[in-house]
């Protein structure tokens, strides 16, 4: 069986394929409901450990789905907990594709538990715009806890920061290994020189 090793654990190619298939189907359901599109790839991205490539299993696949800014305005204007209602609308869109799955809202996300142990957490988000209407790279997302409010995230920046930290660690490790190799070569050279 083909596998990909991640930090000592294994996520099989079959599991990755199943995650990808479910991701595409959920994306299509959300796009159909909120964008009037049948695309399986636009307006969504993997985030969290799976998005960073550091996942060790499939028990928590995080997805950000971008919704139209008009939907933000609609749910923000509602009296009461509009954020909770947004999560319910997203849940209902996904239920159209996965009617037999355990799906529920949980704080900021819609959770989909599959019987095979794979779990998705889908975060609905809206591009945050600057004063001129340009996207600033950040997203607003709902928090239905304590009456509801909006929070902000920048997943691309977080992914880039993680890549930079990993690169720094690799450079540090590479430098350390290089120093060790030079030390060993020096010792071997001295030993060989003494034996000659």
Enumerate the language-model features and the residues they cover.
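A gly/proline- and charged-residue-enriched helix-loop-helix capping module
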Residues: 82-98
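Short hydrophobic/aromatic beta-strand micro-patches
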Residues: 64-66
């Amino acid at each position: 069986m083909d596998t990909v090793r991640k930090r000592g654990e294994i996520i099989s190619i079959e599991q990755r394929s199943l995650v990808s298939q479910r991701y595409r189907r959920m994306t299509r359901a959300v796009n159909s409901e909120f964008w009037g599109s049948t695309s399986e790839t636009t307006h969504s991205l993997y985030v969290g450990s799976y998005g960073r490539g550091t996942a060790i299993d499939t028990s928590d696949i995080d997805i950000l789905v971008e919704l139209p800014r008009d939907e933000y305005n609609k749910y923000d204007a509602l009296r009461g907990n509009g954020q909770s209602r947004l999560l319910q609308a997203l849940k209902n869109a996904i239920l159209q594709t996965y009617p037999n799955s355990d799906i529920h809202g949980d704080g900021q996300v819609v959770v989909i538990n599959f019987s095979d142990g794979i779990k998705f957490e889908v975060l609905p988000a809206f591009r945050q715009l600057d004063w001129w209407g340009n996207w600033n790279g950040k997203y607003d997302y709902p928090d239905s806890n304590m009456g509801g409010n909006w929070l902000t995230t920048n997943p691309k920046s977080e992914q880039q920061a993680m890549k930079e930290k990993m690169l720094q660690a690799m450079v540090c490790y590479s430098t350390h290994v290089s120093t060790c190799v030079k030390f060993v070569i020096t010792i071997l050279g001295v030993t060989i020189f003494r034996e000659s």
